[in-house]
């Protein structure tokens, strides 16, 4: 049975990757269908009710700069906002928001329902239809066939998902949802390498049974940050506190006593878990010298009593979970409303993807999110946007696009995955980026919004706001560079009390701002120097561009050198055995990874600069030198 309409792009899955993919393709004008097993869970936050953080907040800002939904939904759902690393340099500052699960889901669903060119249909997908190495559609569990030119698969943890609590386990995509068994079996038939990963979640606690007076209160920031470049503090709902407590030796003894019934330590779970978000049993085992671990007590929303105890993800049996929770200060009488669990699921080796997130072996089939071995809403959303965008570009007969490592954290994410692959759930950190001084949260729109407009991702309202901001920044920078103060100026007596060293020679306003004791707002409040910019984001941009101009220029020069051969393309059908001078080890690695560019090849472990030189000579001799998009 065939559906009565044909689509340009079909997106399978309605999580963070799927929603961004569907919205991106539809914004670009492609007739798009989003298929989900349950309309009510579109935009569901399956684990931690929070968005952003170190590295992750950078991805959210980039999604937003390209017109995505995650940051906007967070502004409407965020019940506590904080800027992490606020005392450090701008490169590592990151916005994090605690979110109300219900409000976040509602906002995402509202955005989806009002998006032109997008249809939503409730059915689980059981089959991917491939003809002559090209995807042509999907078939749902009731046998309904949908045709499309491109398919974006965002199956999350649902592929052959298995939930573990103690030594008991059962099939599931997440708690309360069925797994995708038939689709997982079908995908294993495709020529793409497959593995198993594991992730977990903590038990949820009834807030009415917690003694918060025994814990440390953690309030949000004042003034309140916003997540979206289009956001405003007026969008935020009521703001509330989180709380901090700790495990103790009694907690650790309870956990050690239950390890014989842990699915992780009894060999029941085969999948590898996330290194940077370990279970509490993993923490006790790996950091046996520590007598306590911090736990963040995070409300799940304004209209629920459920609490997310961030830091005690576990798959131990329920009785052990209850005992360990009640051993923690402030939770002596706590009641669990949902048990913690681990989930194992299939993922596919991202080295089998192009940097457009299209599979190398099946034309028109794109993968995004946890199916590629990542962990986290933000990583999923970034991949979804990129995959949906490239699916739309392909349908339109246009070249694929992916930002380079020096252009966006999205570029770092995709390059790491498609070049190096991953054997454990991949999480973004600022430390993964070589050029993080240029890849800041604050300039994500300056880096990406113009490209997003060119691609058709950015609407008129965002473009108008961005253009106005850019113009105000440029005009203010020109003003600071062109206005000067002389030692005999009547402004000097007003200015000198604010300076460590008094004015002794002619100086521009820009030079004054560059002084370490001066900041933009302080300078603008001094008589004769203001009023300055009213927009705090534009003002912040002016300050950073002035104060860090030397560092930024040096990093840009490094990038210009590195980019010279970065985008030199390598044919996917190139047999490296035919390249004279390469060692057997290098040949094996290049034939296994099939890098798309010289830049990707250079980042594969064991590929030497000499091997790269040999490749460049070979390409030149064969007339194969080309630049990728």
UniProtKB/Swiss-Prot annotation:
Highest taxon listed in the record's lineage: Bacteria
One matching Pfam family: GIDA_C_1st
Transmembrane segments: none
GO molecular function ontology, one term from the record: flavin adenine dinucleotide binding
Cofactor: FAD
Location in the cell: Cytoplasm
InterPro entries xref list: FAD/NAD-bd_sf, GIDA_C_N, MnmG, MnmG-rel, MnmG-rel_CS, MnmG_C, MnmG_C_subdom, MnmG_C_subdom_sf
Keywords assigned: Cytoplasm, FAD, Flavoprotein, NAD, tRNA processing
UniProt main location, coarse: cytoplasm
A cellular component annotation (GO) from this entry: cytosol
Residues that coordinate or bind NAD(+): 273-287
Entry-linked SMART domains: GIDA_assoc_3 (SM01228)
Annotated family: Belongs to the MnmG family.
PANTHER family, A to Z: GLUCOSE INHIBITED DIVISION PROTEIN A (PTHR11806), PROTEIN MTO1 HOMOLOG, MITOCHONDRIAL (PTHR11806:SF0)
Subunit structure: Homodimer. Heterotetramer of two MnmE and two MnmG subunits.
HAMAP family to which the protein is assigned, alphabetical: MnmG_GidA
Protein name (database record): tRNA uridine 5-carboxymethylaminomethyl modification enzyme MnmG
